[in-house]
């Protein structure tokens, strides 16, 4: 695998390399080969992955046909750092941060 380094920008080249490796499935392969996997365990894992893929495909098909509601998009601003429970900042309240 080869990545060009332009203008001595190593960070950008490293980012490109990681992206290529991710696309090729090298990280997943390394994780799987990190230890020995018995053939029976491999078969069970592959079967579970196939079931997961089939369920995901069926769910997407039902969503496209309108029989299942679409997955709600995340609402930014709620949760950590939202209206409540933050650590001060602008509009923190009458006493401000403690």
Curated annotation (Swiss-Prot):
Q: Which UniProt keywords apply?
A: Ribonucleoprotein, Ribosomal protein
A single Gene Ontology MF term assigned here is: structural constituent of ribosome
A GO biological process this protein is involved in? translation
Pfam families listed in its UniProt record: Ribosomal_S21 (PF01165)
Q: Identify the stretch(es) annotated as Disordered.
A: 61-98
**Compositionally skewed regions (Gly residues) per UniProt:** 78-98
- Annotated source species: Bradyrhizobium diazoefficiens (strain JCM 10833 / BCRC 13528 / IAM 13628 / NBRC 14792 / USDA 110)
What Gene3D superfamilies does this protein map onto? Ribosomal protein S8
Instruction: Please give the InterPro entries that the UniProt record associates with this protein.
Output: Ribosomal_bS21, Ribosomal_bS21_CS, Ribosomal_bS21_sf
Family membership, please give it.
Belongs to the bacterial ribosomal protein bS21 family.
Q: Which PROSITE patterns match?
A: RIBOSOMAL_S21 (PS01181)
For this entry, the protein name equals Small ribosomal subunit protein bS21B
Q: GO CC terms for this protein?
A: ribonucleoprotein complex; ribosome
């Amino acid at each position: 695998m080869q990545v060009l380094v332009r203008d001595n920008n190593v960070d950008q080249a490293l980012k490109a390399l990681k992206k290529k490796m991710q696309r090729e499935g090298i990280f997943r392969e390394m994780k799987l080969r990190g230890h020995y996997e018995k053939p029976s365990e491999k078969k069970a894992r592959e079967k579970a992955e196939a079931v997961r893929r089939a369920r995901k495909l069926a769910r997407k098909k039902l969503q496209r046909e309108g029989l299942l509601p679409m997955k709600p998009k995340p609402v930014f601003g709620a949760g950590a750092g939202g209206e409540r429970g933050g650590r001060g900042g602008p509009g923190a309240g009458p006493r401000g941060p403690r």
